Structures are given as C-alpha cells and as structure tokens.
Design a protein with these regions (language model features):
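PLP-dependent amino-acid enzyme catalytic core
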Residues: 2-456, 463-523
Length: 523
C-alpha cells in the first residue's frame, strides 16, 4: 500500500517558522559524537542495478548497539541536571531502546533501570544487564511494563527516558538527517525511514525539510502495525488494537505514534508506504547481498518500502535514494522463517495446490506435465480413492507473465489453486500435509497468535474451557515474541458464533480459516 500525504506550502512555512527552527537548533547542538559514530552512507550496487535507480544505505546497524536508538537516549541523558542524573533513569523496553539507554547510562555514569515484560527472552535481558543496568521483569506486555516504569519514576524520583515522544530524543535521532545531507550528493531525491513511534522520521524530516525541502521524506511501516499511516489518514493519532498489532517487525510494532512525532510528520512527510512480511523478508536478503549483514525486520523496512515505491512512480526517479537501515539486532532463531518467506516476498517461488486423479500412473503423468521446472517443494499423502491433492512449490523468475503461463498450462489438465499469499498454507499446511480427516464432521479451523512465554497454551485452553474438543494442532517456533498456532476445534452445540466469541474473550489474535481453500485441499 502507498499513501501520499500532500504538503501545502503554507504547512511547510508554518513548520519552518515554528517547530522546525527549534528542532534544527537542537539537532545542531546535539553533542553526541563521543559515544555515537557518524554512520557510513554506502552504495548498494546490487539493489541499484536491480531497481534501476541509485540506492544508498545509511548504516545505523554500525552503531555499538547495532541500532540508531542510542542517539536519542544519549542526547536526552547527557543534558540531565546533576541531581536527576545522580538519582538515575528508568525506561520500559525489551528492545533497542533499552540497549541505547543502558549504553548511555554506562557512558555517563548514570544508574539505569529497565523494565521488561516477564516473557522477555534471556538474550535481551542479558544484553542490557551486561551494560550495568538493573533489569526488572514486570507484566505480560509493554503496557504493563510501562506502567511499572512510571510508578518507579514517581516513587524513586527517577527520570523516564521515552523511546520517541520527547524533543531531545527526536533531536538525537534527527542527527541522522544532518549526516545524510552532509554525506549524500546534490542529486539526493528521497529518504526512506522505518516508522514505529515516529521519533526517527520526525527528527530526520524536521532537519531535511528545512535545509533541502525538495528531498522527499517517505515513511515505511509493516502492514500490521501501520500506526502513522492510519494517523495521517485520520488527521489525528489513532490507537491500534493490541490484538491486531503484528509483531513481526517488533522494533516498530507500536500501538500509537507519539504526539510530537505526529505533529511533525503530518507537515513534513511526503508519503507513507506499508509492506508485507514477505516483502520485509525479501528486503533483509537484499541488504545481506549488498553488505553481508543480517538486519532485523524493522531495519529492513526502508528497503522494502523503497522497492515498493519506485515502480509506482509515474516518472523515472533520478538521483540517489537513501534507505535508513535502522538496526541489526535479530534473533538467530528467526533466520529459518525469514529465509522461507524470502522467496515468496521476491515472487521467486510459486506455491500451488493441484488436484490430480488418484490412480496408477497419474503421479508420473503429473511430473511429466511439470517438465523441466525447478521444484522447491512437493508434498503428497494418500487421502481419497478418487483424487489426490499435491502441494507444489515452483521456482520462478519473479515475472507475473511467467507465473500466469505456468498456472494456465497446468490448469488445462488439472484443477489448480494459487496459495503463495495464503497464510494458512505458508505458515502451516506446507509443514503438515498428511491427508484429510473424514472422522470430524463439524470442525472450525483457526490460526492463533500465541505469545512465546510459559503458560500461554494453558491460558488458551483454560479460556476455551471444556465445551470443545481439539481436533487438530500445529505449532512451529519462528524465533519471535509470538508463535503461530493452527488449531482445529470440533464444534459442539454451542455453535460457531459462540466459539468465535470465546476466542475473542481469551485475548489472543486469531483468524478463522474454516473456508480456506488450502484447508479443503489438504486438511
């Protein structure tokens, strides 16, 4: 999705005369370079060739904590009054902000307390405590941790270091914009920026639009956590549903953008682009191929957005396009999932469900019909005396015409269902083909997103109660904060509406898949 927010000259003038002057001054006064490095701006030759446009990477993954977040945290903390610094600071975060605050505190000798949810992985807790910060585990989600941080600040007189909604944090992040204008050529056309709470895009936009107003500022969000896109559409900050918030790009999965960032963004952002999980995974690979660095999903948003934005422009885009690679703090366990989704994101793998006759020789005939195609996946299990269902993965060149010809050719002989964008097929069915069950007559099928923490499944089952019988269950760890579960439930006399209502009450994000064609073919 691409959403353009048109700037009026009046809005820009107002921003320049009011807010922009304040932020430019703060950015220029941000004395952070004894801890923060001016990250390199490097060319991405493979991406530039692929897209037919100049692509530059602003390498914030090169910071000591592998993220830009240290800029804002340090800029705020270095200006604290002596008494406040002696008492210490507190922040609620399990990610890059926590590491930024911890590093700044270690450098300045300021006591740091970080509040994290009880389900925070040990690797994240250890990374923060290794820098001398005190880690407190409280609550099951960010809201719980944040509330406890506020309580600690009041009781102990600690200073809260917010992740994005503070002038000094915004100014610290804005030094990236200052650096880009110093490093980039005069042909700079656009800057692509990942958006979570909005501090980064607010800081960069406020500086760049004042100095080089012709440079486009384009924000990029994951489709399932597009808080800034929705806010700019509505003309006000909106709060995304906790159940609907997609955590794949967890570094930018924020329910509501900040007040200050929104005020700047609605005047200084030219467009917002939203990208899918598969597009993010493909962007991670693109960055790897040019840099040999594996960045985190949030860090690849800018490239995913750039790849989506460029082909949609009515005119060829000249000049350089800068993508801010915001971070590279990725859990190793996530790489398998990212690798699997990358081919789909690049449109280099086509996933199909094909029905062939269940009789001797039909399997051979089907393979001959495929010809010399490069097969990436082939799943089959006997389940019906009359017809067989094959889950087929085929490598393609990514061109829609090639895909269309292949489906048309197979479709002349067999019923074919395209499953490449079918989340049920991609996340679950391809890993569990085993034949359809004829023993269950009334079954409802759901995809459920479970938090990866002890007791999550038990909470789900207890919330479901004893009215329902589980007829199917599939779980696969993806190395993220949330696991994906496919569950079949034999419907009792309570009925479908009552079952959906019960699931909503449990509070986990879910999707009903009872009518999904992949289910009809394989489950």
């Amino acid at each position: 999705m691409l959403w353009v927010y048109k700037l009026s000259l009046k809005c820009v003038d107002e921003l320049q005369s009011n807010e922009m002057d304040k932020y430019i001054r703060k950015i220029l006064e941000a004395d952070i370079y004894d801890l923060v490095q001016m990250s390199p701006l490097t060319k991405a030759p493979r991406l530039s060739s692929k897209l037919g446009a100049g692509v530059m990477l602003k390498r914030e993954d090169q910071q000591e904590i592998f993220s830009f977040k240290v800029r804002g945290a340090y800029n705020l903390m270095r200006q604290m009054p002596r008494d406040a610094a002696r008492r210490g600071v507190v922040a609620a975060s399990a990610g890059n902000h926590a590491q930024g605050v911890a590093l700044a505190g270690q450098h300045l000798g300021i006591p740091v307390t970080i509040v994290m949810g009880v389900n925070t992985p040990a690797i994240k807790r250890d990374a923060v405590s290794a820098r001398g910060a005190t880690v407190i585990l409280r609550g099951e989600n960010f809201d719980d941790a944040s509330a406890h941080a506020v309580t600690l600040a009041k009781v102990k007189g600690l200073t809260i270091v917010p992740p994005f909604d503070h002038d000094d944090v915004i100014a610290g992040q804005g030094t990236i914009g200052m650096e880009i204008l110093r490093q980039a050529s005069s042909s700079l056309n656009a800057i692509f920026i990942p958006v979570g709470g909005g501090g980064l895009i607010a800081g960069v936009a406020s500086y760049v639009k004042a100095i080089r107003p012709g440079v486009k500022i384009i924000g990029v969000e994951a489709e399932g956590s597009a808080g800034m896109t929705e806010a700019l559409k509505a003309g006000r900050r909106v709060k995304l549903s906790a159940q609907a918030l997609d955590q794949f790009a967890d570094g930018t999965a924020v329910r509501q953008v900040g007040t200050r960032p929104f005020q700047i963004a609605k005047q200084a952002v030219d467009a917002m682009v939203t990208v899918s999980v598969d597009e993010i995974c493909a962007a991670i690979k693109d960055i790897f191929e040019d840099t040999r660095v594996l960045c985190e999903p949030a860090g690849a948003l800018s490239i995913a957005g750039l790849k989506k934005w460029l082909p949609r422009q009515p005119q060829p885009q000249r000049g350089d396009h800068v993508a801010v690679v915001s971070g590279a703090n990725i859990n190793f366990d996530r790489l398998r999932h990212i690798s699997e989704r990358t081919a789909l994101g690049e449109k280099k793998e086509l996933l199909l469900g094909v029905t062939i006759p269940e009789r001797p020789g039909s399997f051979l005939s089907f393979c001959r019909a495929l010809g010399r195609l490069s097969i990436t996946e082939f799943n089959y299990r006997y389940a019906d005396p009359g017809e067989a269902h094959v889950l087929l993965g085929v490598e393609t060149d990514g061109l829609p015409a090639t895909e269309h010809r292949l489906i048309e050719r197979l479709g002349r002989r067999y019923p074919v269902t395209r499953l490449s964008e079918n989340e049920l097929a991609v996340l679950h069915v391809r890993h569990m083909v085993g034949g359809r069950s004829t023993a269950i007559e009334k079954e409802q099928l759901y995809r459920v997103e479970f938090p990866e923490r002890p007791g999550a499944l038990l909470k789900f089952l207890e919330g479901l109660g004893s009215d329902y019988n589980i007829s199917l269950f599939h779980y696969r760890n993806h190395g993220s904060a949330f696991g994906r579960v496919l569950i079949g439930i034999e419907r009792s006399s309570a009925g479908r509406q009552a079952l959906s209502s019960r699931l909503r009450d449990i509070g986990y994000r879910f999707w009903e898949e009872s009518a999904n064609p992949a289910r009809d073919l394989f489950l």
